[in-house]
Design a protein with these regions (language model features):
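Short coil turns that delineate tetratricopeptide repeat
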Residues: 194, 200, 234, 268, ...
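TPR alpha-solenoid repeat register
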Residues: 202-205, 239, 273, 278, ...
Length: 378
């Protein structure tokens, strides 16, 4: 059974979200407990702790441009995980008790049984951004207790960090392309963002919507979402890279080339993976304009910045092939395969999932290169 359900997302819609600060936690404290006896189930505190930590670690392991939270297991009892009785769970005291002003995000899960039905109470808080929340998650038909606990942990993370959770869900389902939960989570989270012209968070979500449009093969929609993401935050480098990627999909090679030239000029200290992607995208645009020699030079820069970029080596092999150097093309293509087991790119970058195109009227095609961690999820 899939660990995610739309029930999780519907409950999110009623969560009160404060938007005075960026919507991403720096620290998440996990708390777990059991309340009362649960018939025919053998599960102890260590098992619950491990399941909770495993699910949150899986989400936090997503290769993202946004800072990831430091995750720690808290001592049982903080965040109100002390339950008076199994029959009085709604009186849970989840108020945070910190002597100083800083309050880390907290997620608590309490496994219990009520009228013979196994349930998990998910509670938590997100500092100034997310008020205290409480949600009961009921075991579904055919769902194991372990899967129930994984789902509960996912719900908790969706409350305190909907962006990272949506990003993780998108990557989990890139093979079966069932993005319904990720898309609904994005829609609900965006609905909580103030309609200001500039929004760091809205830009991140719009960028994800562009990638999801590419998964559906809708090039025009993807271009629109990436353009909106850049408008919401012009400093969102992922959105600018992806907008150029979408330019290529629409055969707008000059626009893509100009966009990448400006980006690389304006951000000389850009992250190596992003800068290399910028040069590769620029090279693809040059190929689309039949400028093979300049594409050759641009790709040399991409490789110099990030020698482990498979897409850069692969694109360079294509340039050599077009120049008639088949021996060099084969060597460079082999090098692309040799470095394919290293970090390729961030989850927000379209080139991680799809091939850069330099030929007219091409459909969206999946890339043969991806991150090693992403491969292990399928």
């Amino acid at each position: 059974m899939d660990l995610t359900t739309l029930t999780m997302i519907v409950m999110l819609a009623v969560a009160a979200v404060g938007l005075d600060t960026v919507w991403h936690p720096t620290e998440v404290i996990l708390q777990a407990s059991t309340a009362g006896n649960i018939d025919k189930i053998t599960i102890d505190q260590n098992m619950i702790d491990g399941i909770l930590r495993s699910e949150v670690d899986r989400i936090s392991a997503t290769q993202t441009l946004v800072g990831k939270p430091r995750v720690e297991l808290g001592r049982q009892g903080g965040i109100g995980m002390a339950i008076a009785t199994a029959a009085n769970l709604q009186s849970l005291a989840y108020a945070l008790q910190q002597d100083v002003g800083y309050r880390p995000d907290q997620i608590g899960v309490a496994l219990f049984s009520e009228n013979g039905v196994v349930k998990v109470l998910v509670t938590g808080s997100g500092g100034q951004r997310v008020t205290g929340f409480e949600q009961v998650v009921v075991q579904q038909n055919g769902e194991t207790v372990i899967d129930l606990l994984h789902r509960a942990a996912l719900i908790g993370m969706a409350r305190v960090d909907p962006y990272l959770t949506a990003l993780s869900l998108m990557q989990r389902h890139e093979t079966d392309q069932d993005f319904s939960d990720a898309e609904t989570l994005i829609t609900v989270a965006k609905g909580k963002i103030a309609p200001t012209p500039f929004s760091f968070d809205r830009s991140l979500f719009e960028n994800l919507q562009g990638i999801l449009a590419l998964f559906r093969g809708n090039q025009a929609d993807a271009h629109t979402w990436f353009r909106l993401a850049r408008a919401s935050n012009p400093d969102n480098i992922a959105a600018v890279l992806n907008l150029a990627f979408a330019d290529l999909q629409l055969d707008q090679y000059r626009e893509a080339a100009d966009r990448m030239e400006r980006l690389l000029h304006d951000t000389p200290d850009c992250d190596a993976a992003l800068a290399s992607t910028g040069y590769v995208t620029w090279a693809a645009a040059l190929l689309g304009m039949h400028d093979v020699n300049d594409a050759d030079q641009v790709l040399a820069k991409a490789i110099a910045i990030k020698p482990t970029s498979s897409i850069a080596w692969h694109m360079w092999s294509e340039v050599k092939r077009q120049k008639g150097d088949t021996v060099q093309a084969a060597r460079l293509n082999q090098q692309a395969l040799n470095v394919a087991d290293t970090f390729e790119n961030y989850a927000e970058i379209a080139a991680l999932y799809f091939r850069l195109t330099w030929q007219d009227r091409q459909p969206v095609m999946r890339s043969q290169f991806t991150n090693p961690a992403a491969k292990s999820l399928h």
